[in-house]
Design a protein with these regions (language model features):
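Compositionally biased intrinsically disordered regions enriched in Thr/Gly
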Residues: 22-274
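Alpha-helical transmembrane segments
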Residues: 12-15
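Bacterial N-terminal signal peptides that target proteins for export
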Residues: 1-9
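C-terminal motif of bacterial Sec signal peptides marking the signal peptidase cleavage site
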Residues: 17-20
């Protein structure tokens, strides 16, 4: 396996781990990523600052966390440790790639930022955006969500929020309609997408990262904002989309344990950010 392939596998694994809260969790894994021996987080770093940065001849990496995360120290420590380990693996991969090429000829870059999306009585929702450049025609941006149960002190996701075996066909259609509305708002002559499309297709809701959307009822979520990256529903030039679906599209599908975290209508009517 070449160093380039090894690096890409490491990067992909780390991204999937942080978005595990929006997927079915593996038994007993709970989103943990063991750091590589050369990428260990020191005891001092385990105190979990809000920022991290490092620059070498081969890569520049940085992390920024929101002030809100300090209220959940277990989440804070977990996210910081995972992200720092991943960024160091990225930097090591950059060095390996350039060493294999014979000389440092391209500086890689990765920046990761988490921002507070919304918070309810039980749940804290964060949006994670990772910007990455490793050469090629353009950088890559990946958005994922982190959902934290404040009482249980663990990440939760689709499998916990929704009833097992629920039929999401209606939610899939609502998400697809919202995506097309967002595409038309941004690019009036954009080609519409559909579920099962050939070139571009609407994603299934259960397979799409999300964050909680603010509602008109205090301390509750009024919907879900789905995070859709470049290339998913259109050309790269269209950019990413953050598409919000109201509670009415999925309220009957919520699991009893979290149904009371949702109420009201959306606080913001727009279906996507500018």
């Amino acid at each position: 396996m070449t160093a380039r392939v090894r690096f890409l596998l490491l990067a992909s694994a780390a991204v999937l781990t942080l978005s595990a809260c929006n997927r079915d969790r593996e038994p007993a894994a709970d989103g943990a990523v063991p750091a590589a021996p050369g990428a260990a987080v020191t005891p001092a770093e385990a105190a979990a600052p809000l920022t991290f940065s490092e620059k070498t001849a081969f890569a520049t990496v940085s992390l920024k966390l929101p002030d809100d995360i300090k209220a959940q120290p277990d989440l804070h420590a977990k996210v910081y440790a995972q992200e720092v380990a991943h960024l160091r693996e990225f930097a090591e991969g950059a060095q390996a790639d350039n060493t294999e090429a014979g000389a440092p000829n391209l500086a890689y870059e990765q920046t990761v930022e988490l921002v507070a999306a919304h918070e309810t009585g039980k749940l804290m929702s964060l949006k994670r955006t990772a910007f990455e450049f490793t050469g090629g025609a353009h950088p890559n941006t990946v958005m994922t969500g982190v959902l934290w149960d404040k009482a249980l002190k663990r990440q939760v996701g689709w499998a916990e929020i929704f009833t097992k075996g629920a039929d999401f066909a209606g939610l899939d259609r609502a998400l697809c309609a919202a995506i097309n509305a967002a595409k038309r708002a941004r690019v009036p002559d954009a080609e519409p997408v559909a579920l099962g499309g050939k070139d571009w297709a609407c994603p299934r809701a259960a397979e799409t990262p999300f964050v909680l959307a603010p509602g008109t009822t205090g301390g509750k979520a009024g919907g879900l904002t789905f995070l859709i990256g470049p290339y998913q529903v259109g050309p790269y030039a269209e950019g990413p989309y953050e598409v919000t679906v109201p509670l009415s599209a999925f309220q009957s599908l919520l699991a009893p344990a979290y149904a009371d975290e949702f109420a009201g209508s959306l606080a913001k009517v727009a279906t996507t950010t500018p």
